[in-house]
């Protein structure tokens, strides 16, 4: 069923490609600005900071959307078919959109921004080649942001000077953010730096900032937690007497709530420490609707709950 939906999208895309080549996306925009289409919000936020008003931007995946399970809609295919530049994370994050990106590559600029990260700095996995959640290490995410910047310069070479100035200013924000996360993390004793979440998305966070991390589900939310997984993690939490576990904005809360109940059945009371933004940012117009705000919210929430 899933494959049929993807193939239908690819077929529609083939028809769309001919249409957009005939008319051109720039002709569709009265101001002549190119269209940039992104997948996850963290990439869209980088485009906003670097390109600002020099492009039209369409982000396909909004707040609360799980990119592991996301399938391109007919509307998405139309946006992608009209795009001058497509930016996605890669590393098998947007698994169900792979055929669509492959179809479009060659007819326009299509960039997997996190596949520019050196292989030596990626986390290897058993069930997939690499962990795609690179944005949890702010310094590592800077590689992806640089790929966004370089792609925008290719798209609009006449704007390179402006893009460079904005990119450098944004990179300074990221450097300050990384330093802030490190300070906050170090404010917790080492034995308190244990993070339990709905799925195993925080591996890069663990490596960069000195946390032990456990996820109820695997790296991809397409994998389901078994009863054995639930009981094993509940035993770990009770044994370590952890004060808090965390829900995620893009994943239903029921599994973490069931985990809390399983821990309490073992005689240890654990709290839901708050909601973290993992695979999607917060609502537009809020601090958490930006990458800097999302990361700041996460570390503040984690430290406050684990310090109890």
From Swiss-Prot:
Family (UniProt): Belongs to the bacterial solute-binding protein 9 family.
Entry keyword annotation includes Signal: yes
The protein's gene is named troA
Q: Which Pfam families match?
A: ZnuA (PF01297)
Q: Which GO terms describe its molecular function?
A: metal ion binding
- Which CDD domains does the UniProt record give? TroA
Keywords per UniProt: Ion transport, Metal-binding, Periplasm, Signal, Transport, Zinc, Zinc transport
Record note on quaternary structure: Monomer.
Q: Which residues form the signal peptide?
A: 1-22
What is the protein named?
Zinc-binding protein TroA
